[in-house]
């Protein structure tokens, strides 16, 4: 039995000395191959007596198992080491040196800037941000928001529909961010104070419309929300956003399926020059729509309209960016023109804050 111990010690030393996958494979062949040292011992089992097979045979099998386990473990360790070495050799420095010239630095897209500005304003009022999917069901995009069957927005010429699924249901690219209102009411108990920025999609394209555009809307749900609250919130927003001391607003009766009463909001401005000036002048410009949340919408959100009420408003981010920063054509927002970005973009480190200034 001594020779088995000696052989095991020798083989274990060879396994430990192997430095790569080729050398450990050579050890395996020398020990466990057809003519390997352990394989030759295994061939003697057939000529052993039953008594000898119980002792020496068991020892030979134990040697085989021990050597096999050691080789497999070493092979795995060497393979991992080879992968680590390869990864280290292939390391790429993805960092970039500081660009020496301000002209070479990237710019923040105006839409990203506007979202940050609006988030700063409403965040100071105690609102949080809510988000939802761009691909919506008919229920969340239309039915839950009180759009009746036959409403023009449900037509193919206005909305991007997907092919029906196996259940016959057609999903849509959401036509507004309002479905998030329902999802929030389902998931959260009042009071609710949220803003919902995001992409929306409609079949429209010209200098002031795009098939994909950005909206932001707000929702407040509690037991005492009223029209006076809407007016205060929107006046404070417009003063801060357009960076003027005073704004004059007018609320015109309108119709939206998801609010009752509904209003379109105009802001007084001066349109005599190339850039619209707010807080002065005698002209009027529509900037958003708003209203008290319709009782049917509250019911679809799982709330009792006899206990809760709310108000909501919505506006196009692209449009208010054009108004604030004097951008003439909405289509330029999506053309990826570096020259346009260099002109209208914002410096990356100038994050809008109420105390530091919204538009640096």
Curated annotation (Swiss-Prot):
Keywords: Aminoacyl-tRNA synthetase, ATP-binding, Cytoplasm, Ligase, Magnesium, Metal-binding, Nucleotide-binding, Protein biosynthesis. Its main location: cytoplasm. Its EC number is 6.1.1.20. It catalyses: tRNA(Phe) + L-phenylalanine + ATP = L-phenylalanyl-tRNA(Phe) + AMP + diphosphate + H(+). SUPFAM superfamilies: Class II aaRS and biotin synthetases, tRNA-binding arm. Gene3D superfamilies: Bira Bifunctional Protein, Domain 2. It is found in: Cytoplasm. One of its GO terms (molecular function) is tRNA binding. InterPro entries: aa-tRNA-synth_II, aa-tRNA-synth_II/BPL/LPL, Phe-tRNA-synth_IIc_asu, Phe-tRNA_ligase_II_N, Phe_tRNA_ligase_alpha1_bac, Phenylalanyl-tRNA_Synthase, tRNA-bd_arm. Mg(2+) binds at residue 260. Binds 2 magnesium ions per tetramer. The keyword Iron-sulfur does not apply. It comes from the Bacteria. It is an enzyme of class 6 (ligase). GO terms for cellular component: cytoplasm. The keyword Transport does not apply. Its cofactor is Mg(2+). GO terms for biological process: phenylalanyl-tRNA aminoacylation. Tetramer of two alpha and two beta subunits. HAMAP family: Phe_tRNA_synth_alpha1. NCBIfam families: pheS. PANTHER family: PHENYLALANINE--TRNA LIGASE, MITOCHONDRIAL (PTHR11538:SF41), PHENYLALANYL-TRNA SYNTHETASE (PTHR11538). Belongs to the class-II aminoacyl-tRNA synthetase family. Phe-tRNA synthetase alpha subunit type 1 subfamily. This is Phenylalanine--tRNA ligase alpha subunit.
